[in-house]
Design a protein with these regions (language model features):
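Alpha-helical transmembrane segments of multi-pass membrane proteins predominantly involved
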Residues: 2-507
């Protein structure tokens, strides 16, 4: 009788635990359900599918966002899921909320503007891949197990490969193949490094106390090799130096709304994994501040100087994203709560800036038929309001007032300076110097677009189409937060400061 009662109690506890896990994973379950509905709708209905597919997609995203708002108040602290394979907390919830908002912006942009962008909603393939990417990125932010991290990254990667080459064209197919080859190599390297860590620690679970204890016992060279191999895969998804070569071709070839997604969601998901990995796999034998500092300096410098010579705006923003990856890494190496909060604030503003930039580029692409900077000559005379909007976005990407881009870089540099004063490590001072110099360099290529818009002569060959009011309104809605958060960023800073980053690092 006693044994039966114990079994009944154990079963009840397991069911309760499973119920809690399913509640915590409801946003991801919603994404999966939306994905399945998109496929079924596409199979059942053969004509005029765009309205139905768009309704399913936006309702799914809206419901997932509502669930995330509820979870923000339900999970103020960190909670383990699925036996410790996943970890939910306010930081992962905030990141997932940003991903959902970003995906919604990309889909609205695809629906409202640009050449042949409504093809997104004529069949489910692109939408299914985008929702698959969103699902993988969501699990990346919650993963506490090396195997789950690998699977999540692969889901994001496979969807990205398909999205790059899904449209017709030799250039697009070439970019997709190049992305696939580089991604396969990076995944293999990362998996090999994970196998080393598993061999040394006997565990794949980052939350396992034995994992952290075993890390400190690994000799310097094997530990260094393991970490370099694993970080290689993470850096590839972040798009930082030296695994950034795929970015320009992919950005140029993929549809503009898809590029907007590529430029933000996989990067921020990878950043969350790097943050967790660096804080857990800590050892006196690995000076993360030096290694990540070198990567940050190289990413900022290579990205900015390469962008100077670009004639295509999407390739220019690809190199710009490499430079921004360097700035995102700076927040990690500060190793302070202020640095972590600055990193998250910068990441949030980066999301807003990039989606605004790519939407406006998409509008100009509709008028010129290309994304060449030369073809933007004089368009400021015909499209003055949209040109002013893109000027504001370029100022924000540079990191100048009166935009939130200035606040973001100010917080990053302030956190870096505080960390330098605390530890007096020379590498931190060098990063600060290079960061300031690279900000000056970025000014030259970011303002090249407004220069061509306002100070160059309009080509007679370009026929300007009537700009729809919805383009003006949507562009304004995307740019306005960049101005408002410059003057009133305190509420968002308070939101970021409410996150306990120590709870997010599994112990």
């Amino acid at each position: 009788m006693l044994m039966a009662q114990n079994q009944h109690t154990g079963l009840s506890e397991q069911l309760a635990s499973t119920g809690n896990d399913l509640w915590a994973l409801l946003p991801e379950i919603t994404i999966v359900g939306t994905l399945i509905l998109l496929i079924l709708f596409d199979l059942i209905f053969k004509k005029n599918k765009s309205i139905g597919l768009s309704v399913i997609a936006f309702v799914g995203l809206a419901y997932a966002f509502v669930l995330l708002i509820q979870q923000w108040y339900t999970f103020p602290n960190s909670a383990a899921l699925m036996g410790g394979l996943l970890d939910i907390n306010r930081l992962s919830i905030l990141l997932k909320g940003g991903f959902v908002i970003g995906m919604s912006v990309a889909l609205i942009s695809a629906l409202r503007s640009g050449p042949k962008q409504n093809d997104f909603f004529e069949s489910s393939e692109v939408l299914v891949m985008l929702f698959g990417l969103l699902l993988g990125a969501s699990f990346m932010t919650m993963s506490s197990n090396l195997l789950i991290i690998y699977i999540s990254i692969e889901v994001v990667s496979i969807c990205s490969y398909v999205l790059t080459g899904i449209t017709k064209g030799k250039k697009k197919a070439e970019a997709g193949l190049k992305y696939l080859i580089f991604g396969a190599v990076a995944s293999a390297i990362m998996l090999y490094g994970m196998s080393w860590l598993y061999g040394f620690t006997g565990s794949l679970d980052l939350t396992d106390a034995g994992f952290s204890a075993a890390i400190s016992e690994i000799p310097r060279l094997p530990l260094f090799i393991s970490c370099v191999l694993v970080m290689g895969g993470f850096i590839f998804k972040l798009g930082a130096f030296p695994l950034h070569i795929w970015s320009p071709d992919v950005y140029e070839a993929a549809p503009t709304p898809v590029v907007a997604v590529f430029s933000v969601i996989p990067k921020l998901a990878a950043l969350s994994i790097i943050f967790k990995f660096v804080n857990i796999v800590s050892s006196p034998m690995i000076d993360w501040q030096v290694w990540i500092g070198v990567l940050a300096i190289a990413s900022m410098t290579v990205g900015n100087f390469s962008a100077l010579w670009q004639k295509d705006v999407k390739r220019m923003l690809a190199y710009s994203s490499i430079a921004h990856a360097g700035f995102l890494l700076v927040g990690i190496l500060a190793f302070t709560s202020g640095g972590n909060q600055a990193m998250l604030f910068y990441a949030s503003i980066y999301l807003l800036m990039n989606f605004a930039a790519f939407f406006l580029i998409q509008v100009f692409e509709k008028h010129t038929g290309t994304t060449s900077i030369d073809d933007m000559k004089g368009l400021g005379q015909k499209l003055p309001y949209l040109s002013v909007l893109i000027l504001i976005v370029m100022i924000a990407l540079t990191g100048l007032p009166p935009t939130a881009g200035f606040n973001a870089k100010l917080y990053i540099f302030s956190a870096l300076w505080d960390s330098y004063q605390t530890g007096e490590k020379t590498i931190l001072l060098w990063i600060l110097v290079f960061g300031l110099l690279n900000t000056v360099v970025s000014l030259f290529y970011y303002l090249k677009i407004p220069y061509f818009l306002f100070f160059k002569t309009l080509s007679n060959e370009i026929q300007i189409k009537t700009t729809r009011t919805i383009d003006w309104l949507w562009g304004t809605l995307l740019v306005l937060p960049l101005l408002l958060l410059f003057f009133r960023s305190d509420w968002f800073v308070g939101l970021v400061n409410s996150i306990n980053f120590e709870l997010w690092i599994p112990k």
